[in-house]
């Protein structure tokens, strides 16, 4: 199995999806019987957008490829936290880096794609989800009922670089990007050739909004001081004008509480380093930061919130994964 992840052109993804559905009644290996069809028009609003269900995949391997976003939609996901991008997008990551015996472990925080490649994947996924909704009649709403949420990291200096800034601005409005225009062209060609069931008007391709995401979930490194986290959030809210969530870690609860929870739930084999809790943000500091940023978000006309929970640093036994933590 190759450890190099190579992007697939949108037209090839579309052909794969259509051929598999026609021949096997499955899409990206998900059988039709497992597709989730919304049976009513109920939804909630977040970031000024409609969202049909309160579930979806968190940032990670499950959201870094276009076909994974399509699969998540097919199985009921409607809020998609896209995998985190950062300025260091060409790191050599020792493999394997993920292990899920029951609870999940990972030893890396990079992406397998460069930032421009990740951007392209998210645009392709955006189109695939729109196509599936229209083709299969999955939603009962007359307008979009799902939300794409960016995730960026890990410090202000990196987030301000042209590479990450272009990523953010591109997902806010992708209309002028090469990949968005390519997807429109390829989708129109497929519609005009009669390849897509239940979609016959090529104008459908033009109806897909280029405004893919107006929100960001911020990811920072363990041990990042509260004032630095708040500074990044203020930049995203005040300068980028995006709805902002920040990921907070279980270390806020303190070592003794987390240890007790693990032991009570029979996860006593998980080992933690108490020093990890000493270096991370404290609960009282988090409360102050949240109050400050909620007020700042209101001043700027955007929402601020937190994601609970992000990752927890644990001691690696070294049996299956590299690195010590």
Describe the predicted segments one by one.
Residues 321-325:
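Short, intrinsically disordered, charge-balanced linker/junction segments flanking boundaries
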